[in-house]
Amino acid sequence: MTNSGTVGSPYTPVGGSRGFARAEKDFYPTPAVLTEPLIDRFRVHLDGGVWEPACGDGAICKVLAKHGIESVATDLVDRGYGESRRDFLLELKPPAGVDAIVTNPPFSLWRQFAEHALAMDVGLVALLGRLQLLEGKRLSALFQETQLTRVMVSAGRINMLPAGAEDKGHNGMIAWAWFVWQRFRAVHERPSIEWFTPEKGSS
């Protein structure tokens, strides 16, 4: 997750990690234990190619690659992975050869990322975010208007640490969830919720 702007965030630190200062530009690599369950659940929808538009150091893309899933990695900031200086919010269409957008957006731009991703011609959009995003009035309207398909809730609170920080094994302070939209679904179908248990040691 890399913040493509300088908008302030209403909480510190973004990752809910004890003892760490807020990372510059909200850069918190996504733990593999959060990406693996999404692949397990939606593998068939990811095999058509994935765009990761806030790729950071490639944390999500590396897990996709481990499963043989091709991805296009872009980011506004150069973290040594993918194509940098690409502002997702200014992109007009998805790269060729992808049918899904999977990313962990910067918190301060989460709604903008969601709206922009949903305007793209792809079959699936999956955004990682705080479970409490469901509480916000503006986002609740977005979820209803865009027919959110599924919410995958992590049954364990995982630390999302600043890049390079040592994981001391503490439990995280934030409940994480994948918010998933599928283009081809029954009209007016209600969103479903499911839980997954992150498996420690996944890499």
Show the residue positions of the predicted features.
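Class I S-adenosyl-L-methionine-dependent methyltransferase catalytic core
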Residues: 1-203
